[in-house]
Amino acid sequence: VLADFESKGELSRWYHANQLRQEKSIVRHGSCSARVQLSTARISGVTLLHFPHDWHGYRWLRFSVYNPLNGPLELNCRLDDSRHRRTHGPYSDRFNTQLVLRPGWNDLAIDLEEAEKAPKGRRMDMSHIAGFSLFVVQQKAPLALFLDHVRLN
């Protein structure tokens, strides 16, 4: 498990942790989730930075996101390795995908074999994953999503 939000201390492992709050009323797994407050900034989201970085041997990144809206919401997912971070590589040098969240809970899975092949001209170093980000682009109004049970398998 990369993050299950059962303790408040877990929130500090995320970049933009000030946008996160432990939540007990909307939960997918266990007794807590993370409330992710998103703004109308061009890009608004959170990034997991402090976690086991060796993902070699895992096939899936799984997590659950609750969409409180009455309609679909586009959520972007980004994975990058230490080389991308070190060289400030371009968009094409990392894994990017857009997920469409339906209202309510969405149980999502990222195929790590696809992520490994995503950087143009090279393979992502799955033994040195540097960040996992979830974000929205140019939201029209502030919005809170709920994130739970982030894990590898």
Spell out what each predicted region is:
Residues V1-N153:
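Beta-rich carbohydrate-recognition modules and glycan-binding surfaces
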